[in-house]
């Protein structure tokens, strides 16, 4: 049971502690979702009263996968994938692998091994290329505008920092373009960068000739 003195102190305005209502308001502010960061088209069409899943479904941003149509859309639900017949599985055997066919009791009845792996690999590459070339029409206006933004986006040019450039100049002055020896230098390569990482850093800085100036 609460002490009457403590109860009166909490109700009094002389106390420095926040009241129960003030605490409740603070917790409500903390529970509020953060502002959406992204393209303006998403910010305009985003409904704050809906969940993320509901917004994605309304904007046409959900992938084409089987989704449960029940009242609840919680993440704990698991979607049962459609069963693939054995004949279809047999056609999709990966190169270098075989497939074991079992009956209902679990006994092995057949083992499928592709004899012509090279031909299957070439056919699979052709199918994949055809799938990549097939354009998918956007279903909503939001998706169309997002695709236009993605098509017009330019790559961000990265620049080396002054300290990174100074360090690379020391390596180039000592080893020239021999990145293998740069990676092995324990004194200069204090960050233990690999040969590939050093190559990418030199390329980002403008190349060996730019670092020699």
UniProtKB/Swiss-Prot annotation:
Pfam families: Nop16 (PF09420). Keywords: Nucleus, Ribonucleoprotein, Ribosome biogenesis, rRNA processing. Signal peptide: none annotated. InterPro entries: Ribosome_biogenesis_Nop16 (IPR019002). GO terms for biological process: ribosomal large subunit biogenesis; rRNA processing. Its main location: nucleus. Residues 1-14, 22-34 have a biased composition (Basic residues). The keyword Ribonucleoprotein applies. The keyword Ribonucleoprotein applies. Residues 1-42 are annotated as: Disordered. One of its GO terms (cellular component) is ribonucleoprotein complex. It is found in: Nucleus, Nucleolus. Involved in the biogenesis of the 60S ribosomal subunit. Component of the pre-66S ribosomal particle. Belongs to the NOP16 family. This is Nucleolar protein 16. It comes from Cryptococcus neoformans var. neoformans serotype D (strain JEC21 / ATCC MYA-565) (Filobasidiella neoformans). The gene is NOP16.
